[in-house]
């Protein structure tokens, strides 16, 4: 909406001619600009505050050349929207179909109610979180206790396991001794066989 469109809307709402609506808009704007220029603030309840803000000296950069430029301290106009204006735009407050969009005294009710309701929900969330933590703590204690019992039962099993290999080793020792004996007997039986072969050789020589 531009200035001309704003004047048209005011002409219809005020039920007056265009000249009077134009004068009303221009006078309002002129008054705000002059007051802010002086350093004063213009407050419209429910709508917002027009004020002057002071900016300190700073260092900026030229976007074209990339050079560093020193900016002197300056004053800029600023607008702070009111609580009721914010509530209407955000949807927290319903915009009335008829009458003024913002009224004096309407802001305090919904804004305070919403502010009080939020901490209540936060406190409830904290309460449930502490309850959950309290329930969770015994579960952890029980979990740590269970492995302790398991370890206690496991200890005798290890002792038995170490005994078993000892018996096995004891039985294995005679087996090796027997194995060593066996080749000795074989060697003993093999020796006469060679002797017999030596005796047989001279017999062949005599026949020739």
Curated annotation (Swiss-Prot):
* Positions of disulphide bridges: none
EC numbers listed for it are 1.16.3.1
Q: What is the effect of changing residue 15 to N?
A: In strain: LR222
**Keyword Nucleotide-binding part of the UniProt annotation:** no
Gene3D superfamilies xrefs? IHF-like DNA-binding proteins
Catalytic activity reads: 4 Fe(2+) + O2 + 4 H(+) = 4 Fe(3+) + 2 H2O
Instruction: Name its cellular compartments.
Output: Cytoplasm, Nucleoid; Secreted, Cell wall
Record's Pfam families?
A: Bac_DNA_binding (PF00216)
| C-terminus, required for nucleoid localization, as annotated region | 92-208
Q: Which SUPFAM superfamilies match?
A: IHF-like DNA-binding proteins
Regarding activators and inhibitors, the annotation says: Trans-stilbene derivative 4,4'-[(E)-ethene-1,2 diylbis({5[(phenylcarbonyl)amino]benzene-2,1-diyl}sulfonylimino)] dibenzoic acid (SD1) inhibits DNA binding at 50 uM. SD1 does not inhibit growth in a range of 3-1600 uM.
Annotated region described as Degenerate repeats region, given as residue ranges: 101-205
Q: Which SMART domains match?
A: BHL (SM00411)
Q: How does it assemble?
A: May form oligomers. Interacts with RNase E (rne).
Q: What is this protein called?
A: DNA-binding protein HupB
Name the species this protein comes from.
Mycolicibacterium smegmatis (strain ATCC 700084 / mc(2)155) (Mycobacterium smegmatis)
**Lineage, please?**
Bacteria, Bacillati, Actinomycetota, Actinomycetes, Mycobacteriales
